[in-house]
């Protein structure tokens, strides 16, 4: 299955630091009431947060940041020897409040997106 996300650009990104390239995929859930609210937040320059992708419970995928760029989804996080997770990862947000199961359509879309991301990097 080829995944073609809807392009919804965010201004909240920058260049990957120190020649970084994706080595990790970081999955988040939005903890927001709606997909639309999450999409708005991830694209609002006042909030200085973004992700490369957002997936709705219906399986709709939005891409907000080009994979070659550094999205702002992992804060100042580190993982093992990786001190700047944002520069070394692809961030994927799943629209979910966090208090109910993820929808089947969302998981199918995520699996397709993951296959594509892993093949590219």
What label would you give each PLM region?
Residues 25-27, 90-93:
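Oligomerization/assembly interface segments of phage tail-like spikes and tubes
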Residues 46-49, 86-91, 97-121:
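Long, well-ordered alpha-helical scaffolding segments within enzyme catalytic domains
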Residues 1-83:
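N-terminal catalytic cores of peptidoglycan-degrading enzymes
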């Amino acid at each position: 299955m080829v995944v073609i996300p809807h392009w919804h650009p965010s201004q909240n990104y920058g260049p990957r630091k120190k020649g970084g390239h994706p080595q990790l995929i970081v999955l988040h859930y939005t903890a927001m009431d709606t997909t639309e609210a999450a999409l708005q937040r991830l694209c609002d320059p006042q909030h200085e947060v973004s992700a490369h992708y957002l997936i709705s419970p219906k399986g709709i995928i939005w891409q907000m940041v080009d994979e070659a760029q550094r999205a702002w989804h992992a804060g100042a996080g580190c993982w093992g020897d990786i001190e700047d997770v944002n520069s070394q990862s692809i961030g994927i947000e799943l629209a979910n409040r966090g208090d109910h199961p993820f929808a089947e359509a969302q998981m199918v879309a995520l699996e397709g997106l993951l296959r594509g991301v892993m093949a590219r990097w």
